Design a protein with these regions (language model features):
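Extended, low-hydrophobicity, polar/charged segments
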Residues: 1-132
């Protein structure tokens, strides 16, 4: 069973990864937000681009996908299924999210992939994020 990392362990893992990659960053904190509408209440107006991050599983439950796209866009799961050619998708459970990403609903981020030591989760980025 996966042990839930503490908030400080999560922060330390991300900052250590960014430091090792020599990526400059500033930390901003806000509560976990299950919707973009709630998250927007905490975002700074600094020109940053924000994403929706959704965690899916395939119909067999043996493949998992983190999908990141512009927060101002909508996503049709059926369109995503057709584009990714991965079969029927559904949202992964909180237990799967914790097991593979070390995260809870409302806090999904690509940084959760740091916790995926076995590289089980497939990451898909919306091409529109290239222009951020």
């Amino acid at each position: 069973m996966w042990n839930k990392p503490s908030d400080s362990e999560r922060i330390d893992a991300v900052t250590a990864w960014l430091d090792a990659a020599d990526i400059a960053y500033d930390l901003y904190f806000h509560p976990a937000s299950p919707t973009i509408e709630l998250a927007k209440r905490h975002w700074r107006d600094d020109g940053s681009k924000h994403c929706k991050n959704l965690f899916f599983r395939n119909h067999k439950g043996n493949r998992h996908y983190l999908v990141c796209f512009d927060c101002d866009r909508t996503l049709s799961i059926h369109d995503l299924e057709a584009r990714l050619h991965q079969g029927k998708l559904s949202f992964a459970s909180p237990e799967r999210m914790m097991r593979y990403l070390g995260l809870e609903p409302g806090s999904v981020s690509p940084f959760g992939l740091i916790n995926d030591a076995e590289h089980h989760v497939h990451l898909f980025l919306d091409r529109n994020l290239l222009y951020c």
